[in-house]
């Protein structure tokens, strides 16, 4: 009887601490998109709609995710020149006010 009471006490303690851990900001189910491989071919700038940088410590590599006009997302290496040129192109394109 003492063993089951001690086991129940231990189980309740673990359950109480696990809810506190889950309530922490890092434990929130946030979607972090990670890139494990990079697109090997250069993407035409005219096909690109926007981009976002992946710098999360939860991801193995820093990356840039481009979104195409067809809605596809492609991972690219931010160190490659064509990726940097595409980022500059999209920054200028999105800054230009439309009439």
Curated annotation (Swiss-Prot):
<dbReference type="GO" id="GO:0048020">
    <property type="term" value="F:CCR chemokine receptor binding"/>
</dbReference>
<dbReference type="GO" id="GO:2000353">
    <property type="term" value="P:positive regulation of endothelial cell apoptotic process"/>
</dbReference>
<dbReference type="InterPro" id="IPR039809">
    <property type="entry name" value="Chemokine_b/g/d"/>
</dbReference>
<dbReference type="GO" id="GO:0048246">
    <property type="term" value="P:macrophage chemotaxis"/>
</dbReference>
<dbReference type="GO" id="GO:0044344">
    <property type="term" value="P:cellular response to fibroblast growth factor stimulus"/>
</dbReference>
<dbReference type="InterPro" id="IPR001811">
    <property type="entry name" value="Chemokine_IL8-like_dom"/>
</dbReference>
<feature type="disulfide bond">
    <location>
        <begin position="35"/>
        <end position="75"/>
    </location>
</feature>
<dbReference type="GO" id="GO:0005615">
    <property type="term" value="C:extracellular space"/>
</dbReference>
<dbReference type="GO" id="GO:1905563">
    <property type="term" value="P:negative regulation of vascular endothelial cell proliferation"/>
</dbReference>
<keyword id="KW-1015">Disulfide bond</keyword>
<dbReference type="InterPro" id="IPR000827">
    <property type="entry name" value="Chemokine_CC_CS"/>
</dbReference>
<comment type="subunit">
    <text>Monomer or homodimer; in equilibrium. Is tethered on endothelial cells by glycosaminoglycan (GAG) side chains of proteoglycans. Interacts with TNFAIP6 (via Link domain).</text>
</comment>
<dbReference type="GO" id="GO:0030335">
    <property type="term" value="P:positive regulation of cell migration"/>
</dbReference>
<keyword id="KW-0395">Inflammatory response</keyword>
<dbReference type="GO" id="GO:0071356">
    <property type="term" value="P:cellular response to tumor necrosis factor"/>
</dbReference>
<dbReference type="GO" id="GO:0071346">
    <property type="term" value="P:cellular response to type II interferon"/>
</dbReference>
<protein>
    <recommendedName>
        <fullName>C-C motif chemokine 2</fullName>
    </recommendedName>
</protein>
<feature type="modified residue" description="Pyrrolidone carboxylic acid">
    <location>
        <position position="24"/>
    </location>
</feature>
<dbReference type="GO" id="GO:2000134">
    <property type="term" value="P:negative regulation of G1/S transition of mitotic cell cycle"/>
</dbReference>
<feature type="signal peptide">
    <location>
        <begin position="1"/>
        <end position="23"/>
    </location>
</feature>
<comment type="function">
    <text>Acts as a ligand for C-C chemokine receptor CCR2. Signals through binding and activation of CCR2 and induces a strong chemotactic response and mobilization of intracellular calcium ions. Exhibits a chemotactic activity for monocytes and basophils but not neutrophils or eosinophils. Plays an important role in mediating peripheral nerve injury-induced neuropathic pain. Increases NMDA-mediated synaptic transmission in both dopamine D1 and D2 receptor-containing neurons, which may be caused by MAPK/ERK-dependent phosphorylation of GRIN2B/NMDAR2B.</text>
</comment>
<dbReference type="GO" id="GO:0043615">
    <property type="term" value="P:astrocyte cell migration"/>
</dbReference>
<dbReference type="Pfam" id="PF00048">
    <property type="entry name" value="IL8"/>
</dbReference>
<dbReference type="GO" id="GO:0043524">
    <property type="term" value="P:negative regulation of neuron apoptotic process"/>
</dbReference>
<dbReference type="GO" id="GO:2000502">
    <property type="term" value="P:negative regulation of natural killer cell chemotaxis"/>
</dbReference>
<dbReference type="GO" id="GO:0008360">
    <property type="term" value="P:regulation of cell shape"/>
</dbReference>
<dbReference type="GO" id="GO:0048245">
    <property type="term" value="P:eosinophil chemotaxis"/>
</dbReference>
<keyword id="KW-0873">Pyrrolidone carboxylic acid</keyword>
<dbReference type="GO" id="GO:0071347">
    <property type="term" value="P:cellular response to interleukin-1"/>
</dbReference>
<dbReference type="GO" id="GO:0002548">
    <property type="term" value="P:monocyte chemotaxis"/>
</dbReference>
<dbReference type="GO" id="GO:0070098">
    <property type="term" value="P:chemokine-mediated signaling pathway"/>
</dbReference>
<dbReference type="GO" id="GO:0007010">
    <property type="term" value="P:cytoskeleton organization"/>
</dbReference>
<dbReference type="GO" id="GO:0090280">
    <property type="term" value="P:positive regulation of calcium ion import"/>
</dbReference>
<dbReference type="GO" id="GO:0051968">
    <property type="term" value="P:positive regulation of synaptic transmission, glutamatergic"/>
</dbReference>
<keyword id="KW-0964">Secreted</keyword>
<keyword id="KW-0202">Cytokine</keyword>
<comment type="similarity">
    <text>Belongs to the intercrine beta (chemokine CC) family.</text>
</comment>
<dbReference type="GO" id="GO:0006954">
    <property type="term" value="P:inflammatory response"/>
</dbReference>
<keyword id="KW-0145">Chemotaxis</keyword>
<dbReference type="GO" id="GO:0034351">
    <property type="term" value="P:negative regulation of glial cell apoptotic process"/>
</dbReference>
<dbReference type="GO" id="GO:0008009">
    <property type="term" value="F:chemokine activity"/>
</dbReference>
<feature type="disulfide bond">
    <location>
        <begin position="34"/>
        <end position="59"/>
    </location>
</feature>
């Amino acid at each position: 009887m003492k063993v089951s009471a001690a086991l129940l006490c231990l189980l309740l303690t673990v359950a109480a601490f696990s809810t506190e851990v889950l309530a922490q900001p890092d434990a929130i189910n946030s979607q972090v998109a990670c890139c494990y491989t990079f697109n090997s071919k250069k993407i035409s700038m005219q096909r690109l709609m926007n981009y976002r940088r992946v710098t999360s410590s939860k991801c193995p590599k820093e990356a840039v995710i481009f979104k195409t006009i067809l809605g596809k997302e492609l991972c690219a290496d931010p160190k490659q020149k064509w990726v940097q040129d595409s980022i500059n192109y999209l920054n200028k394109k999105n800054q230009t006010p439309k009439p």
